[in-house]
Amino acid sequence: MRYNQFSYIPTSLERAAEELKELGFDLDLQKTAKASLESFLRKLFFHYPDSDYPLSHLIAKNDMDALSFFQSEQELSKEVFDLLALQVLGFIPGVDFTEADAFLDKLAFPIHFDETEIIKHIHHLLATRCKSGMTLIDDLVSQGMLTMDNDYHFFNGKSLATFDTSQLIREVVYVEAPLDTDQDGQLDLIKVNIIRPQSQKPLPTLMTPSPYHQGINEVANDKKLYRMEKELVVKKRRQITVEDRDFIPLETQPCKLPIGQNLESFSYINSYSLNDYFLARGFANIYVSGVGTAGSTGFMTSGNYAQIESFKAVIDWLNGRATAYTSHSKTHQVRADWANGLVCTTGKSYLGTMSTGLATTGVDGLAMIIAESAISSWYNYYRENGLVCSPGGYPGEDLDVLTELTYSRNLLAGDYLRHNDRYQELLNQQSQALDRQSGDYNQFWHDRNYLKNAHQIKCDVVYTHGLQDWNVKPRQVYEIFNALPSTINKHLFLHQGEHVYMHNWQSIDFRESMNALLCQKLLGLANDFSLPEMIWQDNTCPQNWQERKVFGTSTIKELDLGQELLLIDNHYGEDEFKAYGKDFRAFKAALFKGKANQALIDILLEEDLPINGEIVLQLKVKSSENKGLLSAQILDYGKKKRLGDLPIALTQSSIDNGQNFSREPLKELPFREDSYRVISKGFMNLQNRNNLSSIETIPNNKWMTVRLPLQPTIYHLEKGDTLRVILYTTDFEHTVRDNSNYALTIDLSQSQLIVPIASN
């Protein structure tokens, strides 16, 4: 374990003493440091009628227990304080450590003993993470140190778990959206599942916009998947044009219906544990799936601003600007009289994507988004540089396949009976509009590109993204983060994992940092919390997070690739082609071992190479035919210890998100030896070699200059490392599988790898 503590708010002595007193730690500022520490420790054992007993189970020195120490005349020293602090946080002498000083250095322990600062040290200790993954104060509250009185209690600028999660209100409302996406002449109704604590105070809301939450249709999804085996189409030379079109909602009328009291209820919905954490701290949770999902009406428009509007309508309702009904019969309306109107959205992948889309509307009431692994341009999710390009792990998927997966209205037999014919018509229109034949950018994709509206974002923004996420690739967060207005508060956590959540990792206090931010933004708490704009997980060692100023630098280093002419054959033998098509993982294994069709260049680094931004391959290329696709991957190659990309569970249920509520495992990325690490990758239709809007011809056997931008990253290579460049054509995971007999030739003498270099 290593501490990377970003959530602690430095506090004055007076404020620290006041907050400790509010918790029941009545520490006399006139007492000695030793007496104050003893008083604090005894309070920790509030379950015991006699605190001597648990105190005797701690050691103050290698040859003295804590009870004996406090009964002695010996003075409090750094060694005693450190040893006791470690034990209070759950670290066991002789098991987790033998030499306390060395262990503290390894931990990067954030508290440095000064006898005159004992009150501030105790305050800081309470806000510091235990071995279990919870802060000490959260651990104590989870054990019942504070009663669940359904009121707010704060410590170090963060809300504590004092809301009763055993008496939650669970209700359903149906919000009227200014849409008619299925064109039935009726405004669409949006189902909203609400979970909120009982409280006399207006509550802020965490809203998870999740098209998955009302169920998914995997059978329809699998039937809709596309075969990837097809020839790469030769496209006509042309220029693509699109236009920015404002989304115009339909008109709605003020509701004059009586207020209803009898709301639909529910017992369970699959929740997000970060939401659960805040539910116990006085934040209502709502789950909304939007148009075209079970319980709602309308068509699943998948990514455009009509879908975004269906979530926006819910925020409007929370602020009194839209109508919600008690049921589909629309006989009574219901108002969000429990809400303070301030909303933060949460969730990963499609959920985080909807958060980004919502933020670009500038809707009033949306105070903050926490968007994890989020898409900012749907074209860049299903296409790349004029190519059909599947997200990592999902060959054959496209946006209409996702529509089939998430159109959960068809899981309700009655809805299927009444509406499936119309749904199939609209789905067919969507399938035609996305133009899988060419892979080109068009108006359909432009209408699903949130980047063009990034200037309208006015809420606070928090993004998390994995630099090993080949599903929602790093370009998605790179482009939106760098497009955000300079006037807003923005934060980015870049980790070394893949498509995963990070709120329950051991090495980063993400949960507590979000608590401090949300108390500021949604509860109006003046806590003086300041979070760095960008925090990056160091790839060279375990559990080390660093502040970064920018994602993408203008300083570059050009690396020569060699002097040879390299030939890349596109064609595989029939058996090999079928085997790779059946299992793209077998293709990847062969590719990284140099066994698949490829041009391979190894560069031994003579100095450190701190990459920050978008690597570009500038290549001199020619094709034997009038078509060609180019794929590239950059590897950190050779056996050494690296971070894994999937977090593993260190404990099974040590994190309590309330008071015995929604327990979850503590996780972390492992650090272990492997043979390589993908740093970046990229794909291009050579007919789109200059830009996305220009379709050009490929002259047979004529040299072309190609700039292939790879996925942005921040990655540190060290002197002596091997950087491996792999150039090839068909990628069996991502691209169409064209097995035609053509070849690409690369002139390495006129080619370079252009690397953006991080400054110190």
Curated annotation (Swiss-Prot):
Top-rank EC class of the record's enzyme: hydrolase
Coiled coil ranges: none
Compartments in which it is found: Cytoplasm
Entry's transmembrane regions: none
Assigned EC number: 3.4.14.11
Broad class of the protein's primary localization: cytoplasm
GO molecular function: aminopeptidase activity; dipeptidyl-peptidase activity; serine-type peptidase activity
Keywords for the protein's UniProt record, in alphabetical order: Aminopeptidase, Cytoplasm, Hydrolase, Protease, Serine protease
GO cellular component: cytoplasm
Catalytic residues of the enzyme: 349, 469, 499
Catalytic activity: Hydrolyzes Xaa-Pro-|- bonds to release unblocked, N-terminal dipeptides from substrates including Ala-Pro-|-p-nitroanilide and (sequentially) Tyr-Pro-|-Phe-Pro-|-Gly-Pro-|-Ile
Superkingdom in the source lineage: Bacteria
Gene Ontology BP term (one): proteolysis
Alphabetical list of Pfam families matching this protein: Peptidase_S15 (PF02129), PepX_C (PF08530), PepX_N (PF09168)
PANTHER family the UniProt entry points to: COCE_NOND FAMILY, PUTATIVE (AFU_ORTHOLOGUE AFUA_7G00600)-RELATED, PEPTIDASE S9 PROLYL OLIGOPEPTIDASE
Family membership: Belongs to the peptidase S15 family.
Described function: Removes N-terminal dipeptides sequentially from polypeptides having unsubstituted N-termini provided that the penultimate residue is proline.
Assembly mode: Homodimer.
Stated name of the protein: Xaa-Pro dipeptidyl-peptidase
